[in-house]
Amino acid sequence: MQQFEEVHSILEKAKKITVLTGAGASTESGIPDFRSANGLYADANVEMYLSRGYYNRSPKEFWKHYKEIFQINTFHQYKPNRGHRFLAELEEQGKDITILTQNIDGLHQLGGSKHVIDLHGTLQTAHCPKCKAGYDLQYMIDHEVPRCEKCNFILNPDVVLYGDTLPQYQNAVKRLYETDVLIVMGTSLKVQPVASFPQIAKREVGATTILVNEELTGQEYNFDYVFQNKIGEFVEGLSSRK
């Protein structure tokens, strides 16, 4: 209980809060953890199907597999959960809060957060590789192979594919160097370069670091506070301190 009280006080006083989220932030909305032992990424071919090279070589086949892997046609059923709303509420209270998410579901934005850096892109949109016109999720659902209405080019998904660089990485690191508090929620911290963020925040910036994850990550030494909880449980614990 004392940890909850201390963290509540830290968040009350913090000027700039950065939150790094992973799959655990969305599993409470019913979205499967694609990287789990039984997840869709367990298929040996998935990395090929979701690669930039495969999109370039076989864009029609790419879209078929992309839709199957991410279950695009049923994605509207997923809604923001208590964790998403909690972060949006912090922002509504006037906190300078930025979310760095590894998730591609767009639920932080749907939950009301305005300052979100999608490290791995988003499933919610795609764009024309020629004219850059944007298209939403419903357009992708409605068209077997989505094409630009103006150029007729097959759309490029806004998810970062294997073989792509992380276009938002530098923006994320810049934010880390400005932050007072880093909260890491629902990620095993196994994927680089994101796995280095807690060390940057604690060792180089001197920020207060907080981990919320059901499983231990092996990086507990980089955190001032460790909560081995579901995110919803953590939020409930903080709420009871008000």
From Swiss-Prot:
Textual note on the cofactor: Binds 1 zinc ion per subunit.
Active site: 120 (proton acceptor)
Localization per Swiss-Prot or TrEMBL: Cytoplasm
Sequence ranges assigned to domain Deacetylase sirtuin-type in this UniProt record: 1-242
Keywords: Cytoplasm, Metal-binding, NAD, Transferase, Zinc
UniProt binding sites for nicotinamide: 34, 104-105
Top-rank EC class of the record's enzyme: transferase
Binding site for NAD(+): 23, 27, 34-35, 102, 104-105, 120, 187-188, 213, 231
Residue ranges of the TM segments: none
Pfam families reported for this sequence: SIR2
Ligand binding (Zn(2+)): 128, 131, 148, 151
GO-annotated cellular components: cytoplasm
Cofactor(s) of this protein: Zn(2+)
Family annotation (PANTHER family): NAD-DEPENDENT PROTEIN DEACYLASE, NAD-DEPENDENT PROTEIN DEACYLASE SIRTUIN-5, MITOCHONDRIAL-RELATED
Protein family according to the UniProt entry: Belongs to the sirtuin family. Class U subfamily.
NCBIfam families with a match to the protein in the record: PRK00481.1-1, PRK00481.1-4
Name under which the protein is recorded: NAD-dependent protein deacetylase
